[in-house]
Swiss-Prot record:
Keywords, sorted A to Z: Chaperone
Gene name linked to the record: Dnajb5
A Pfam family it matches: DnaJ_C
Originating species: Mus musculus
Protein's name according to its UniProt entry: DnaJ homolog subfamily B member 5
GO molecular-function terms, A-Z: protein-folding chaperone binding; unfolded protein binding
Length: 348
C-alpha cells in the first residue's frame, strides 16, 4: 500500500490550499530534527516534506488522487491514462523545503545556530504558527519571541549550549615500504574513500581522495604519518585523523637493524679455510668485493662502514652494511679426502 499523504499531514482529502500549508507548517515544526530528538524524526520530517510537495502542486495532487502513490511515481494507470508521461520521484531536501516555506530561513537557527547568523528571518512570523498549545515547537525553550522578549509567563527560559563535538579516534593503516624506498626516499599515493558533509551541513556524500605520503630518507619502521581530520565527517563529529604507520617489506637479500643493513654471505668450507673474495651487493645496487684472507668461522661478521641506510635526522650520514658469514659444509667426504685432512689439519 502506498503512502497516504493526507494522513501524513493530518488533513482530509478535500483540504484546500490554505489548509495544506497550515498542516505542513504544524507537522514540519513538530518533527523538525532540531527540536524532535526521536529516532524516526528525520524520516518523518522527510515524509512530511514529500507529502507537502505533492499536495501543494495541483498536477501532482490530481495524479495522486486518481492513482495513489504508486500511480503517481510510475506515471499514472497501467493503461496509460492522462498521467502516462509524468513520473514523480521526490528528490528534494526536506530542510530546503522547510527553509523555503519560512522565507528562506530555518526558524530553529535562532536557538541552535544563532552564532552563525544575526540576520532577521524574512517572511517568518512566530505568531503565524498554527500549532496546538501543547505542541508548541519552541516549548522546550520557554515562551520567547524572536525579538528576545517574553510572550507569556508559561515557562522560565532554559539556557542553551551548543553540543560539543568530539573527534573520532584515529584511523590507522599499515604502510609497507621497501628498503630501497627508505634509502632513496619516495612519495606514495594512497586513495581513501570517506564521507564528507555537504554545504547544507546536514547531509553527507561519499568521495574519494588521493593522499600523497612523502617518505623521507632513513625513516624507521613504526614512523607515523598523520593526515589531520581526513576521516569520515558527519553533522555530529570531528573527522578522525588518518594515520599511516611504516612497516618494512621483506627483502630478498637484506634485513634491517636501525640504520644498519644485514646481509648473509654463504661460502664453502674450502673458501672459509683457504680464503676467498666475496662480492657483496649494496642497497643502492652496487657490488663491493670483500677479500677474506683469514679463516672464516660460521657467524663471523665483517662491517662495510657507511654502506647502510641514511640517518633520519642527518641523511648525508649512513649506517653500516654488516656481512654475516655462513659456511656450507659438504654432506660427505671420500676416504682419500678424509685422510688428507687428517694429515694437514691441526688437532686443536
Amino acid at each position: 500500500m502506498g503512502k497516504d499523504y493526507y494522513k501524513i499531514l493530518g488533513i482530509p482529502s478535500g483540504a484546500n490550499e490554505d489548509e495544506i500549508k497550515k498542516a505542513y507548517r504544524k507537522m514540519a515544526l513538530k518533527y523538525h530534527p532540531d527540536k524532535n530528538k526521536e529516532p524516526n524524526a528525520e524520516e518523518k520530517f522527510k515524509e512530511i516534506a514529500e507529502a507537502y510537495d505533492v499536495l501543494s502542486d495541483p498536477k501532482k495532487r490530481s495524479l495522486y488522487d486518481q492513482y495513489g502513490e504508486e500511480g503517481l511515481k510510475t506515471g499514472g494507470g497501467s493503461s496509460g491514462g492522462s498521467g502516462g508521461s509524468f513520473h514523480y520521484t521526490f528528490h528534494g531536501d526536506p530542510h530546503a523545503t522547510f527553509a523555503s516555506f519560512f522565507g528562506g530561513s530555518n526558524p530553529f537557527d535562532i536557538f541552535f545556530a544563532s552564532s552563525r547568523s544575526t540576520r532577521p528571518f524574512s517572511g517568518f512570523d512566530p505568531d503565524d504558527m498554527d500549532v496546538d498549545e501543547d505542541e508548541d515547537p519552541f516549548g522546550a525553550f520557554g515562551r520567547f519571541g524572536f525579538n528576545g522578549l517574553s510572550r507569556g509567563p508559561r515557562r522560565a527560559p532554559e539556557p542553551l549550549y551548543p553540543r560539543r563535538k568530539v573527534q573520532d579516534p584515529p584511523v590507522v593503516h599499515e604502510l609497507r615500504v621497501s628498503l630501497e624506498e627508505i634509502y632513496h626516499g619516495s612519495t606514495k599515493r594512497m586513495k581513501i574513500t570517506r564521507r564528507r558533509l555537504n554545504p547544507d551541513g546536514r547531509t553527507v556524500r561519499t568521495e574519494d581522495k588521493i593522499l600523497h605520503i612523502v617518505i623521507k630518507r632513513g625513516w624507521k619502521e613504526g614512523t607515523k604519518i598523520t593526515f589531520p581530520k581526513e576521516g569520515d565527517a558527519t553533522p555530529d563529529n570531528i573527522p578522525a585523523d588518518i594515520v599511516f604507520v611504516l612497516k618494512d617489506k621483506p627483502h630478498a637479500h637484506f634485513r634491517r637493524d636501525g640504520t644498519n643493513v644485514l646481509y648473509s654471505a654463504l661460502i664453502s668450507l674450502k673458501e672459509a679455510l683457504c680464503g676467498c673474495t666475496v662480492n657483496i651487493p649494496t642497497i643502492d645496487g652496487r657490488v663491493i668485493p670483500l677479500p677474506c684472507n683469514d679463516v672464516i668461522k660460521p657467524g663471523t661478521v665483517k662491517r662495510l662502514r657507511g654502506e647502510g641506510l641514511p640517518f633520519p635526522k642527518v641523511p648525508t650520514q649512513r649506517g653500516d652494511l654488516i656481512v654475516e658469514f655462513k659456511v656450507r659444509f659438504p654432506d660427505r667426504l671420500t676416504p682419500q679426502t678424509r685422510q688428507i685432512l687428517k694429515q694437514h689439519l691441526p688437532c686443536s
